[in-house]
Curated annotation (Swiss-Prot):
CDD domains: PseudoU_synth_EcTruB, PUA_TruB_bacterial. It catalyses: uridine(55) in tRNA = pseudouridine(55) in tRNA. This is tRNA pseudouridine synthase B. GO terms for molecular function: RNA binding; tRNA pseudouridine(55) synthase activity. Responsible for synthesis of pseudouridine from uracil-55 in the psi GC loop of transfer RNAs. The active site is at residue 48. One of its GO terms (biological process) is tRNA pseudouridine synthesis. Keywords: Isomerase, tRNA processing. Belongs to the pseudouridine synthase TruB family. Type 1 subfamily. It comes from the Bacteria. Its EC number is 5.4.99.25.
Length: 314
């Protein structure tokens, strides 16, 4: 019995969406999916409704590799309001405490420096992490606080941009799993005044080019232009997509010949000279340049398939 065909197009790749403020990541994901008429879509780590900026959206087979972007570095621009603490650590929450600003410039510099490098961070209750199968923010909305373990994070760079009155602007380059709201809340406590996020923009994810970001309005304009020209919208939309292997671009590339690719695609490990000694790799067919999927070097030094691209008929 053949499986039912998915609704929508077999379109594969990654769209770098510039998420608007006030919208949830899932809302914009569904809009992009509809605009592209894609049969599958998924994002690579949610942005808060308050936040704007780069939200990579994976379409089709690219959704299989979105997990690798979750492990990538991110860069943010954030503006904090000093002197007020909120229950969500951002401007969408309720003010729970107000305190005067009494710290010196030297104390601010020392506090900022304490966040640089490898540290431990206790996630906010207003996060999508799960405790006993339920998201933390669901507990928080019921007024329930549950235990959270501190997690290792790395802040590679923390730049002081400006301070004007009770506003502090920073740029932060950080590792996966870093909550900017929590950094700002913790900073406010170190300064003794409290703080919360009033502006947050994700500037970059991994090595994706910032200039390839597009807005929902730009996508809709292309749809309208295609209709006016009486051509398929895909003709204008699809060139915006990054390659489906781009979420895993940080991993080494292994090219295998067509003869080996047949075995690899059928789930069998293959030998390839020049492959790394261990770890995950991206696997391409050398003759066609076609991305085959992710492999891992096994104990015998072979490239074993771990996640494969399945080609759907057009």
């Amino acid at each position: 019995m053949s499986r039912p065909r998915r609704r929508g197009r077999d379109v594969h790749g990654v769209l770098l969406l510039d998420k608007p403020q006030g919208a949830s990541s899932n809302d914009v994901l569904q809009k992009v999916k509809r605009i592209y008429n894609a049969n599958r879509a998924g994002h690579t780590g949610a942005l808060d409704p308050l936040a704007t900026g780069m939200l990579p959206i994976c379409l089709g087979e690219a959704t299989k590799f979105s997990q690798y972007l979750l492990d990538s570095d991110k860069r943010y621009r954030v503006i904090a309001k000093l002197g007020q603490r909120t229950d969500t650590s951002d401007a969408d929450g309720q003010v729970v405490e107000e305190r005067p600003l009494t710290f010196s410039d030297e104390q601010l510099a020392a506090a900022l420096d304490s966040f640089r490098g490898e540290t431990q961070q206790v996630p906010s209750m207003y996060s999508a992490l799960k405790y006993q199968g339920k998201k933390l923010y669901e507990y928080a909305r019921q007024g329930i606080e549950v235990p959270r373990e501190a997690r290792p994070i790395t802040v590679y760079e923390l730049l002081f941009i400006r301070r004007e009155g009770d506003e502090l602007e920073l740029e932060i380059h950080c590792s996966k799993g870093t909550y900017i709201r929590t950094i700002i809340d913790d900073l406010g406590e170190k300064l003794g005044c409290g703080a919360h996020v009033i502006f947050l923009r994700r500037l970059a994810v991994s090595k994706y080019p910032v200039e390839r970001m597009v807005t929902l309005e730009q996508l809709q304009a292309l749809v309208d232009e295609a209709a006016a020209q009486d051509i398929p919208a895909a003709q204008l939309l699809d060139p915006l997509l990054m390659p489906m292997d781009s979420p895993a671009s940080d991993y080494p590339l292994v090219n295998i010949p067509e003869t080996s690719a047949v075995y690899f695609k059928n789930g069998n490990p293959v030998r390839q000279s020049g492959a790394p000694l261990n770890g995950l790799v991206r696997v391409m067919e050398s003759e066609s340049g076609k991305f085959l999927g992710m492999g891992e070097i096994d104990d015998e030094g072979r490239v074993a398939p771990r996640r494969l691209v399945v080609e759907y008929p057009a």
